[in-house]
Structure formats: C-alpha cells, structure tokens
C-alpha cells in the first residue's frame, strides 16, 4: 500500500527518488501530458469563477477529479520507481519561503525578482531538464514569486474552520456555493486551495499549474484534508447526487477518462494511506 508522507518527513533518499522520477516523466514526455490535461479541463471562467473545459459540463467536481488525476500521476511515477509516493505539503504548518520543500535538494526556491525565473534546484532552467513546453505565454522556464501575490498562506485555524463545516456542498454547486467543498477549493471564505496557488505564483497561478512540481504536493494535501473532513463528518454524503443541470453528479462519468464517476472516488483507502 502506498503511503503518502508529509514532505517535511521525507528522507534525503526519498526526496532524491521523487525528483528523479519526476524528471524522467519530463524527459519521456509523459509529464507534459498531465499539464496539457489540466489546462484543458481546469480553466477558470473569470466572470463566474466556475471551472471546466471544452466540452465539459460545469462546474467540474473538484475533489474527485483531482483524486483521479493525482492517482494517475502517482502511478506514472511508480512506473519509473515503484518506491515513490506523492508527498504532501502541509502549507498550514510549512508556511514560509524557508520551508524544507523550497531547498535546492528538493523543489528549489522562489524566482528572481526581474522575471520570476527559478534559479536553484533540479527544476531550474539552468539545469536544462525542465523546459516549460505547455504554457500560456512565451516564457519557457519555471517561474515562482513566493509570497508576492498574497502575503500569507492559510493558517491551521483557518483550515480547522473549513473542516468544521458539516455540509459537503450545496446548490448551485459552483463558486457561489456554501459548504466544505467550495471553502476548501477557495472561492469563498478563507480561500484555502486557491490562495496557495496565488502565493506560489508563476505557472501555479495559471491553468498550466502542474508545470510546477509543487502542484502535486499541494493537491495531495487537499486530498488529505478531504479525508480528514470525511472522518469528522461520517454521516455527510457527497452531493449533488443526480439530476442537477450543468453539474457532474455523483454517478456521472468524468472527462477525460469517461470510465470513472465521483462515486468511485469518495475514499482513498483502496489506493493509498497517509502518514497521519
């Protein structure tokens, strides 16, 4: 069984193996396929805040969709090195630019002030190993501006305030909704998930956010929070369950796979566990 660990607890060898597997996926072209898929199916409508993609019903089921997306990526990593698991970044604890994940032996740090170019670590442009091929502009290098777009990452108190919400979601099931899903996604309230994307900056603040490997650690933590919410609220079911216009319901299939439903992805226990 795969165990997803807090990145702060990774050994030097676990970091090295994770980075090596990510770089191999980049080298063989599979990594950019994930970036392309995300850019196609997770796009923000600046007028409504809803997310979706060409030919996809809106809004897309944020938590189940990303659970499958991360499972596919984790399996791709394990096809390179079976010992690798996706680590998660608890940004409510590791909240500064000095956190261990930004070290040169792991993800590298923030970008330079002139253009955001990441200058250290294995994904810096100077290594020649990380060209940004799926992009929203002409810049071909990884960019970050840690703590510039928004000053503070979410606190544990803010996380707990969202975990305390007893309802998973409610109509109209979009960026205007109340409930756990929308507050975790970050369209309302303390803006958890979305705020982290903006805090990192660079490609993380765009539809091609998987260009930054921290994307996977961020979303792995979102899945951990979903699992924690489910433990706190065992009687709260997933909604919407059916017959909802312009929404992917519980038993609807999700693109791009077309063979998996939110109902198939409500629990992680068949696929992995967490170290907490």
Swiss-Prot record:
Q: What is its EC number?
A: 1.14.18.1
Sorted alphabetically, the Gene Ontology BP terms of this entry are: melanin biosynthetic process
Q: Which UniProt keywords apply?
A: Copper, Melanin biosynthesis, Metal-binding, Monooxygenase, Oxidoreductase
Report the superkingdom from the record: Bacteria
Q: Which reaction does it catalyse?
A: 2 L-dopa + O2 = 2 L-dopaquinone + 2 H2O; L-tyrosine + O2 = L-dopaquinone + H2O
Functional note: This is a copper-containing oxidase that functions in the formation of pigments such as melanins and other polyphenolic compounds.
Q: Which organism is it from?
A: Streptomyces galbus
Q: Which cysteines are joined by disulfide bonds?
A: none
Q: How is the cofactor bound?
A: Binds 2 copper ions per subunit.
Which residues of the sequence carry a binding annotation for Cu cation B?
193, 197, 219
Q: What is this protein called?
A: Tyrosinase
Q: Which family does it belong to?
A: Belongs to the tyrosinase family.
Q: What class of enzyme is it?
A: oxidoreductase
Pfam families in the record: Tyrosinase (PF00264)
């Amino acid at each position: 069984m795969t165990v997803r660990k807090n990145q702060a607890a990774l050994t030097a060898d676990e970091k090295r193996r994770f980075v090596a597997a990510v770089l191999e996926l980049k080298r063989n072209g599979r990594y950019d396929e994930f970036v392309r898929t995300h850019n196609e199916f997770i796009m923000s409508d600046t007028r409504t805040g809803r997310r979706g993609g060409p030919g996809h019903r809106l809004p897309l089921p944020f938590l189940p969709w990303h659970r499958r997306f991360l499972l596919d990526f984790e399996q791709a990593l394990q096809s390179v090195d079976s010992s690798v698991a996706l680590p998660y970044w608890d940004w409510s604890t590791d909240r500064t630019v000095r956190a261990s994940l930004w070290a040169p032996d792991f993800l590298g740090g923030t970008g330079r002030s002139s253009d955001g170019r990441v200058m250290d670590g294995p994904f810096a442009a100077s290594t020649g190993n990380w060209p940004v091929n799926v992009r929203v502009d002409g810049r071909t290098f990884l960019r970050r501006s840690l703590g510039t777009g928004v000053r503070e990452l979410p606190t544990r108190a803010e996380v707990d305030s969202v975990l305390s919400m007893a309802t998973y979601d409610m109509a109209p099931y979009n960026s205007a909704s109340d409930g756990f899903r929308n507050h975790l996604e970050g369209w309302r309230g303390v803006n958890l998930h979305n705020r982290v994307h903006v805090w990192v900056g660079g490609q993380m603040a765009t539809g091609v956010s998987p260009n930054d490997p921290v994307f996977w650690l961020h979303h792995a933590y979102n899945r951990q929070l979903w699992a924690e919410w489910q433990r706190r609220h065992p009687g709260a079911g997933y909604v919407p369950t059916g017959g909802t216009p312009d929404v992917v319901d519980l038993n609807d299939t999700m693109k791009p796979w077309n063979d998996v439903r939110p109902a198939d992805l409500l629990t992680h226990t068949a696929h992995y566990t967490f170290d907490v």
